[in-house]
Swiss-Prot record:
The lineage of its organism: Bacteria, Pseudomonadati, Pseudomonadota, Gammaproteobacteria, Enterobacterales. One of its GO terms (molecular function) is ATP binding. Residues 187-416 form the Sigma-54 factor interaction domain. Residues 481-500 bind DNA. CDD domains: AAA. Keywords: ATP-binding, DNA-binding, Nucleotide-binding, Phosphoprotein, Transcription, Transcription regulation. This is Anaerobic nitric oxide reductase transcription regulator NorR. ATP binds at residues 215-222, 278-287. It comes from the Bacteria. Required for the expression of anaerobic nitric oxide (NO) reductase, acts as a transcriptional activator for at least the norVW operon. Activation also requires sigma-54. InterPro entries: AAA+_ATPase (IPR003593), GAF (IPR003018), GAF-like_dom_sf (IPR029016), Homeodomain-like_sf (IPR009057), NorR (IPR023944), P-loop_NTPase (IPR027417), Sigma_54_int (IPR002078), Sigma_54_int_dom_ATP-bd_1 (IPR025662). The modification 4-aspartylphosphate is found at residue 57. GO terms for biological process: phosphorelay signal transduction system.
Amino acid sequence: MSFPVEVLAGIAIELQRGIGHQDRFQRLITTLRQVLACDASALLRYESRQFIPLAIDGLAQDVLGRRFTLEGHPRLEAIARAGDVVRFPADSDLPDPYDGLIPGQESLKVHACVGLPLFAGQNLIGALTLDAMTPEQFEVFSDEELRLVAALAAGALSNALLIEQLESQNMLPGSSGVFEPIKETHMIGLSPAMTQLKKEIEIVAGSDLNVLIGGETGTGKELVAKAIHQGSPRAVNPLVYLNCAALPESVAESELFGHVKGAFTGAISNRSGKFEMADNGTLFLDEIGELSLALQAKLLRVLQYGDIQRVGDDRSLRVDVRVLAATNRDLREEVLAGRFRADLFHRLSVFPLFVPPLRERGDDVVLLAGYFCEQCRLRLGLSRVVLSPGARRHLLNYGWPGNVRELEHAIHRAVVLARATRAGDEVVLEEQHFALSEDVLPAPSAESFLALPACRNLRESTENFQREMIRQALAQNNHNWAASARALETDVANLHRLAKRLGLKD
């Protein structure tokens, strides 16, 4: 059987009709699935010894969130090494990466598979995969015909990557000015909220502006900081991380600015602080809202003048550091309450970013679940970890108060439970493997709600609510602060600090 000229022309036309790359890619693989009458098709990008799905048709949605490493998927490794059309026989010993991921056929193995490596010159840039439940599905198509399809797909992908590279070098009008393409390996999500966030990251990454990253706990603010650093001219230099919430007041200044020998008891040698470590690079200050006012003043001076002073030293050191800061607090409210310096807030928030909570990201929940399933599969040495349709619906219907971090923990816990109840190395996650309900966390009793004063302002009511939550967590965990922190899904240092601010401890 040969492709009619009209079919190839139709594929080429479809590649030009899309508004953006994603739309073109989707049109391509949808058209190919129809023309080849197969059950599933996928376009994958090759990067750092792994294949990243760009567009799929006929596969479960969570495939878009998975990252297929060559080491973990022998068929994809064979495609990457082949340099030409690869046909896998129905009795192939190599597991198919999409087994259990074709909707309606979850319990059946994929029988026929064709892999088409995609090249730009001599460089592997991606692959097309075609799968069918019928063993002889692709025998009617010659290798030459499939090479034509691969050439069309490679051209589309190569053009998209070239445009991305040109935009990253500020060579196109209206481009973002990003120094190099941002790798989106861990920035998973196609929702409007995440698409907007990625655009904003691209805009600010190539500049040298300080960035304030806001968002609820567990949304992935550290990943945003990493993406900004990777897309900046400073990417060749260090990205240094510091959690301000975990800093005891007595050592916070030394951690930030360093100290000299003899500056205080225990200072037995000179020590560089985080600012020195990040010189010519980027410093990420997580939970910036937890810094004391005294340290805020010293941080402001560094941002204003670019010099630091080690504890116990009279000399100043010049540093060139870009500061990225993150917080789950409303710093405007903190400024009004006198807990955060207004001048520091304005210095940090030159370009503010907001990471959306998971409940506002729609189907991204499923994509992220696929990513974590693949992580668990590799970590535990399983042949496959897939979500049942019921499990997908269950994940979509939950509110995720702990955001992406809670989803990650839920997937890991579900895999362990499912593995314990099923023999073999194949795991299917069902709804019953997830303990997702609004009463998972300790909740205030009805009596405690009634006991709260009804005429307080919002801040006072919020603080009363926080006090009640902490009291109940402590009571339910025998006043063990570490266990209470785990129950409330916060770190123990942050819980101690909050309890002290709320007057629950000295």
